[in-house]
Amino acid sequence: MVKVGVNGFGRIGRLVTRAAICSGKVEIVAINDPFIDLNYMVYMFQYDSTHGKFNGTVKAENGKLVINGKPITIFQERDPTNIKWGEAGAEYVVESTGVFTTMEKAGAHLKGGAKRVIISAPSADAPMFVMGVNHEKYDNSLKIVSNASCTTNCLAPLAKVIHDNFGIVEGLMTTVHAITATQKTVDGPSGKLWRDGRGAAQNIIPASTGAAKAVGKVIPELNGKLTGMAFRVPTPNVSVVDLTCRLEKPAKYDDIKKVVKQASEGPLKGILGYTEDQVVSCDFNSNSHSSTFDAGAGIALNDNFVKLISWYDNEYGYSNRVVDLMAYMASKE
């Protein structure tokens, strides 16, 4: 089992740790966060307002974080070049601070002895992989990779199934997205993105997202055919993608349902889900799929123009894919 270090113990850092422990696919051996001391880590890992209390044991012992009896080395370095990943036994590092998202910045972890870095965010220059879509293109000459964004992980598997079966001529995506840590509790300054600084709990906030364009990087045939935007809404977790697209081959909505259901039970099992239930966002909290197609919510204008709806737990689904990507990479060593 590959040994992993986590840099940044925020929402994704903590949930990647939780997903790793719950799945047993990779082993967390080290965590670095300069802003959270050991006792605070115990508390933050144990109690989670969104996903509930951790179902296991967590304590601080001999300067280490001990989860379910396994000690994890703790670092508190601001400069990633100073983190001694190698000494802690970490072969891979999850870069989940949201700060070191380029090849150059994420590459700092290699200096401390890590063999590979997985950026848990989109990257301007690191190759992006989406499980179930293009992960098989990974080869072990790559030292730094990106797991793309939670929204790209939701959209890409659905877009792949639709494109493989019917062909997508062009499409527009909207994600209705839960609040994240980058937003403000009340109105405040927010750099160049003025709207993003408005109170998160009070507003529906139009925002930009690179998620749809990024699909073109993981499915090259769709490059230039998709774009989209986001609405940030006052819910704490779970988001939904609305993909409106023009199809090359005409298809009845029932045909679309059929191929998505088949994919969800076959090649994309565990990644793309399918439901015909009368679901709402809360029903997907702590769901580990990247994307769950909502058969009852979509609608067709005609056989070539459809709106498709797919839900995702933007925290937990994504964190599980980070773990899956690392497990896949380890299988190629």
Swiss-Prot record:
Glyceraldehyde-3-phosphate dehydrogenase activity is inhibited by fumarate, via the formation of S-(2-succinyl)cysteine residues. The record marks H177 as: Activates thiol group during catalysis. NAD(+) binds at R11, I12, D33, R78, S120, N314. Residues 1-146 are annotated as: Interaction with WARS1. CDD domains: GAPDH_I_C, GAPDH_I_N. Coiled coil: none annotated. The modification S-(2-succinyl)cysteine is found at C150, C245. The modification N6-malonyllysine is found at K192, K213. GO terms for molecular function: enzyme binding; glyceraldehyde-3-phosphate dehydrogenase (NAD+) (phosphorylating) activity; microtubule binding; NAD binding; NADP binding; peptidyl-cysteine S-nitrosylase activity. Pathway: Carbohydrate degradation; glycolysis; pyruvate from D-glyceraldehyde 3-phosphate: step 1/5. The modification ADP-ribosylcysteine is found at C150. Its EC number is 1.2.1.12, 2.6.99.-. The modification Phosphoserine is found at S120, S146, S149, S239, S310, S331. The active site is at C150. D-glyceraldehyde 3-phosphate binds at S149, C150, T151, T180, T209, G210, R232. The modification Phosphothreonine is found at T73, T151, T175, T180, T182, T209, T227, T235. The modification Phosphotyrosine is found at Y40. There is a cross-link at K184 (Glycyl lysine isopeptide (Lys-Gly) (interchain with G-Cter in SUMO2)). Changing C150S: Abolishes sulfhydration and induces impaired enzyme activity. The modification Deamidated asparagine is found at N7, N62, N68, N147, N153, N223, N314. It is found in: Cytoplasm, Cytosol; Cytoplasm, Cytoskeleton; Nucleus. The [IL]-x-C-x-x-[DE] motif is a proposed target motif for cysteine S-nitrosylation mediated by the iNOS-S100A8/A9 transnitrosylase complex. Homotetramer. Interacts with TPPP; the interaction is direct. Interacts (when S-nitrosylated) with SIAH1; leading to nuclear translocation. Interacts with RILPL1/GOSPEL, leading to prevent the interaction between GAPDH and SIAH1 and prevent nuclear translocation. Interacts with CHP1; the interaction increases the binding of CHP1 with microtubules. Associates with microtubules. Interacts with EIF1AD, USP25, PRKCI and WARS1. Interacts with phosphorylated RPL13A; inhibited by oxidatively-modified low-densitity lipoprotein (LDL(ox)). Component of the GAIT complex. This is Glyceraldehyde-3-phosphate dehydrogenase. It comes from Mus musculus.
